[in-house]
């Protein structure tokens, strides 16, 4: 690294005017302090990582069971009741329950068709042709896991199938580039390019986020094109959860329940989510189900 190169910390200053002579291969304690002070990002310790890994696996197992139970004729309230049973079985706490203002009333989010995210379970049976995102967030021994998946009910339309596939493809494409020192904005670039292949749009009202010690931490991970140059570092844990719309990217919040976000043109939306750890050589998908 040369003195006139941009500093590895993402400050947009030259290395000689910033962290010179400290190189990117810096001691982990220094890295942890730097990211806490500069970005308010928690670089997790090995002990924290192990506990977050456990929370993420519990979260993934609960999500898998809920997706298996999501069938035509089942209500999302019934899925919420199953979620409560599964959380108890795993000695886990559902993070969404009573979270926020107004308090979220259920243990999971179930977002159908044109609902972008934060759908509230209800007594309406699932119908043939529905697509649904189930979002599960668990607290296990004080640490958090977070992931979501799309479910297709019966025979769905070609456009609904495509938007589900596009969201998953965008998530996997973003994960494939993750490594230390990658600028955060590269994630949004990859996702935008993936959505554009299908002629779809990327929601920019909601973002991924740091997770593990808290439910929502820094950094906020934009899925659209942006200019965030924070470099990824080993020990960072965050979600990537691209929300892809068939039509326009804009959505609106339900004026009655103040939670559900819907597409403004009532076109379908899809989302997949994983929690990911940045490692020394790449990344680990913590919510990838280990059966």
Curated annotation (Swiss-Prot):
An annotated Gene Ontology molecular function: initiator methionyl aminopeptidase activity
Binding site for a divalent metal cation 1: 135, 146, 273
Protein family: Belongs to the peptidase M24A family. Methionine aminopeptidase type 1 subfamily.
Keyword Hydrolase: yes
UniProt subunit comment: Monomer.
Catalytic activity: Release of N-terminal amino acids, preferentially methionine, from peptides and arylamides
Cofactor annotation remark: Binds 2 divalent metal cations per subunit. Has a high-affinity and a low affinity metal-binding site. The true nature of the physiological cofactor is under debate. The enzyme is active with cobalt, zinc, manganese or divalent iron ions. Most likely, methionine aminopeptidases function as mononuclear Fe(2+)-metalloproteases under physiological conditions, and the catalytically relevant metal-binding site has been assigned to the histidine-containing high-affinity site.
Positions annotated to bind substrate: 118, 216
UniProt-listed NCBIfam families: met_pdase_I, PRK12318.1
Keywords: Aminopeptidase, Hydrolase, Metal-binding, Protease
Designated name of the protein: Methionine aminopeptidase
Binding site for a divalent metal cation 2: 146, 209, 241, 273
Designated gene of the protein: map
Purpose of the protein: Removes the N-terminal methionine from nascent proteins. The N-terminal methionine is often cleaved when the second residue in the primary sequence is small and uncharged (Met-Ala-, Cys, Gly, Pro, Ser, Thr, or Val). Requires deformylation of the N(alpha)-formylated initiator methionine before it can be hydrolyzed.
Gene Ontology biological process terms, A to Z: proteolysis
């Amino acid at each position: 690294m040369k003195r006139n190169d941009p500093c590895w910390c993402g400050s947009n200053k030259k290395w000689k005017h910033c962290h010179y002579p400290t190189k990117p291969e810096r001691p982990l304690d220094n890295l942890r302090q730097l990211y806490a002070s500069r970005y308010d990002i928690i670089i997790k310790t090995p002990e924290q990582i192990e506990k977050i890994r456990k929370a993420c696996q519990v979260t993934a197992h609960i999500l898998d069971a809920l997706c298996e139970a999501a069938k035509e004729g089942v209500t999302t309230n019934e899925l919420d009741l199953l979620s409560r049973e599964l959380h108890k079985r795993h000695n886990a706490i559902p993070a969404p329950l009573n979270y926020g203002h107004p308090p979220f009333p259920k243990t999971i989010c179930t977002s159908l068709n044109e609902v972008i995210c934060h759908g509230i379970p209800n007594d309406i049976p699932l119908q043939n042709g529905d697509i649904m995102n189930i979002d599960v967030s668990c607290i296990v021994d004080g640490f958090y896991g977070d992931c979501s998946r799309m479910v297709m009910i019966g025979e769905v339309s070609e456009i609904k199938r495509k938007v589900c596939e596009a969201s998953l493809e965008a998530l996997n494409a973003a994960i494939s580039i993750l490594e230390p020192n990658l600028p955060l904005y590269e994630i949004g670039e990859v996702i935008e390019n993936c959505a554009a292949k299908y002629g779809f749009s990327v929601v920019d009202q909601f973002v991924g986020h740091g997770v593990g010690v808290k439910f929502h931490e820094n950094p906020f991970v934009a899925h659209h094109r942006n200019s965030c140059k924070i470099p990824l570092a080993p020990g960072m844990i965050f979600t990537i959860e691209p929300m892809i719309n068939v039509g326009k990217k804009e959505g609106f919040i339900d004026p009655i329940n103040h939670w559900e976000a819907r597409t403004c043109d009532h076109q379908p939306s899809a989302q997949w989510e994983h929690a990911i750890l940045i490692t020394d050589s790449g990344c680990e998908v913590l919510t990838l189900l280990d059966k």
